[in-house]
């Protein structure tokens, strides 16, 4: 079994896309409109068929609580190597 997609909760998909693509160098894979949001994924340029990062809107109230709790406790939600 292999992980295909993993989510990164973002406040703004357009800003997150600019950061992950232009600053970190990830390559856009899918950009599919879905109402107010998009199914927006990127992959590593070193492994274009690897795990897709889904830039997932943090619109659900629980995601904001989750992110705030991790930040308050100093726990990183994502790590790249």
Model-identified regions with their sequence ranges:
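Vicinal oxygen chelate
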Residues: 1-7, 27-81
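Conserved active-site tyrosine of GNAT-family acetyltransferases
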Residues: 16-21
């Amino acid at each position: 079994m292999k992980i295909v997609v993993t989510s990164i909760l973002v406040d703004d998909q357009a800003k997150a896309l600019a950061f992950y693509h232009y600053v970190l160098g990830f390559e856009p894979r899918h950009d599919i409109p879905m109402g107010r949001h998009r199914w927006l994924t990127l992959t590593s340029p070193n492994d274009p068929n690897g795990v897709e990062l889904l830039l997932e809107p943090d619109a659900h109230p629980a995601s904001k609580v989750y992110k705030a709790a991790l930040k308050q406790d100093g726990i990183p939600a994502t790590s790249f190597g």
